[in-house]
């Protein structure tokens, strides 16, 4: 969210010669017929510093994109300011305090951090907070793009950042992520259906298993809450006898929702992506299971029913195996 700074300064003029400014009562507005003018070297210096900081901030905001327009001539999405943006920023801050604990726990359970990413802070938050439909987060769209990139044998972060390193965004990918999230937040649509349609257009379809001459999807829904994450974990790791699969995992609670993703392979292990914490890899399902159950579920604060720890839906997708 772009900050709006209001600068106020009081000026005192038309003082007679020899008048002691230091002994005068600090004025507000106009005293008698005298215009107000209080000017000190210190206040002037402070204003210069603030102006310089503002200019640098605006310049850095613009330079965060590799170019001003997308390949098809579209500008980075933004909307009018709403007070909900302030609330979402505070929620992001609370979640961002959990980042160190989650990341530090990965190595303790034999995992590796592939990429440190967090939509709850830093430059990416600055981008999504610009629009009311992405200010609360872009987890659904991020996970869809992550699945597509991984299925293509690529990295989402190579596509999102210039050179694959944090610093400058590639506007085409940033725009695509934000737009998918915006499309899924429209009042007359189902976000899951919007995401499923987008994935299908990108060559990734829901897995279907033939049963009694029918081809139903293998989506799994369940509850967490006081039951813990065991049922959720089983749904994530189940590859339906095929040996691998992509997972889009929707978590819901009393007041919020969140989406995470995973690629599960019986031979190479589990690659896990949470837009709040980053991309992690565990060489086998057992290591991932212990980490998810004994550490991640609580460290992330996802176990709270008031947050997202009440129910779940797990969607499984097929694509070319990578």
Curated annotation (Swiss-Prot):
<protein>
    <recommendedName>
        <fullName>Cysteine protease yopT1</fullName>
        <ecNumber>3.4.22.-</ecNumber>
    </recommendedName>
</protein>
<dbReference type="GO" id="GO:0005576">
    <property type="term" value="C:extracellular region"/>
</dbReference>
<feature type="active site">
    <location>
        <position position="139"/>
    </location>
</feature>
<dbReference type="GO" id="GO:0006508">
    <property type="term" value="P:proteolysis"/>
</dbReference>
<feature type="region of interest" description="Disordered">
    <location>
        <begin position="42"/>
        <end position="69"/>
    </location>
</feature>
<dbReference type="InterPro" id="IPR003951">
    <property type="entry name" value="Peptidase_C58"/>
</dbReference>
<comment type="similarity">
    <text>Belongs to the peptidase C58 family.</text>
</comment>
<comment type="function">
    <text>Cysteine protease, which is translocated into infected cells and plays a central role in pathogenesis by cleaving the C-terminus end of the human small GTPase RhoA/ARHA, a regulator of cytoskeleton. Once cleaved, ARHA loses its lipid modification, and is released from the cell membrane, leading to the subsequent disruption of actin cytoskeleton of the host cell.</text>
</comment>
<dbReference type="Pfam" id="PF03543">
    <property type="entry name" value="Peptidase_C58"/>
</dbReference>
<keyword id="KW-0614">Plasmid</keyword>
<dbReference type="GO" id="GO:0004197">
    <property type="term" value="F:cysteine-type endopeptidase activity"/>
</dbReference>
<dbReference type="InterPro" id="IPR038765">
    <property type="entry name" value="Papain-like_cys_pep_sf"/>
</dbReference>
<dbReference type="InterPro" id="IPR006473">
    <property type="entry name" value="Peptidase_C58_Yopt"/>
</dbReference>
<feature type="active site">
    <location>
        <position position="258"/>
    </location>
</feature>
<keyword id="KW-0843">Virulence</keyword>
<keyword id="KW-0645">Protease</keyword>
<keyword id="KW-0788">Thiol protease</keyword>
<feature type="active site">
    <location>
        <position position="274"/>
    </location>
</feature>
<keyword id="KW-0964">Secreted</keyword>
<comment type="subunit">
    <text>Interacts with human ARHA.</text>
</comment>
<keyword id="KW-0378">Hydrolase</keyword>
